[in-house]
């Protein structure tokens, strides 16, 4: 399983209920749908231009004003656990990290192994758009798209055997989700055989 956002909850729950330990490109980002599509259409290039980044007032996120993507677990923090005003000094390291994750994303998608992409808060029109974008990028890839929503959003209208409808209640205030409904949904869809293989304490979130 590979997270396509919308936020950290997806990556966190994938780790809790599988053997996955390594990071993927979108794992610890907040990614609005339009930002996700823009990132994919750009082949994950040019998303960290210095003149497009700004520090949010609460100093918890660096935001991209062009894509709307928010980086909360990427830039180093100071002793007060804030992202410092001089966050751009850390940009070379952050770019190196995302260059690596970009290469990993494409290498995995070009392998013979099937992939299930997982996206939270996505309607049927968006699901179809995302499926078509992934197919255009990786025409030989055997993939599924698991769409996670708290209620019925008409995903059946997309009429695609690739799209999996997962109904999972909205997460708690910590943004990491409720493990029990995730375990039930992932197991029921055949996406994991190892629910609760890790505890919350086992999962390392960078700069959390």
Question: Where does each model-flagged region fall?
Answer:
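Extracellular glycan-modifying ectodomains
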Residues: 1-208
């Amino acid at each position: 399983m590979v997270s396509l956002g919308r936020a950290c909850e997806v990556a966190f729950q994938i780790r809790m209920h599988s053997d996955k330990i390594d990071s993927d490109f979108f794992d610890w980002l907040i990614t609005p749908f339009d930002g996700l599509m823009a990132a994919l259409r750009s082949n994950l290039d040019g998303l960290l231009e210095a003149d497009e980044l700004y520090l949010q007032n609460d100093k918890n996120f660096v935001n991209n004003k062009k894509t709307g993507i928010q980086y909360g677990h990427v830039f180093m923090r100071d002793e007060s656990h804030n992202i410092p005003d001089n966050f751009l000094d850390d940009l070379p390291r952050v770019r190196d990290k995302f260059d690596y994750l970009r290469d990993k994303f494409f290498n995995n998608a070009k392998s013979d192994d099937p992939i299930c992409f997982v996206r939270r808060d996505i309607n049927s029109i968006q699901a179809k758009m995302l499926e078509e974008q992934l197919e255009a990028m990786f025409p030989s890839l055997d993939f599924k798209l698991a769409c996670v929503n708290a209620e019925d959003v008409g995903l059946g209208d997309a009429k695609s055997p690739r799209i999996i409808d997962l109904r999972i209640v909205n997460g708690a205030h910590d943004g990491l989700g409720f493990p029990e409904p995730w375990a039930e949904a992932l197991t029921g869809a055949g996406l994991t055989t190892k629910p609760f293989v890790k505890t919350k304490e086992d999962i390392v979130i960078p700069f959390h």
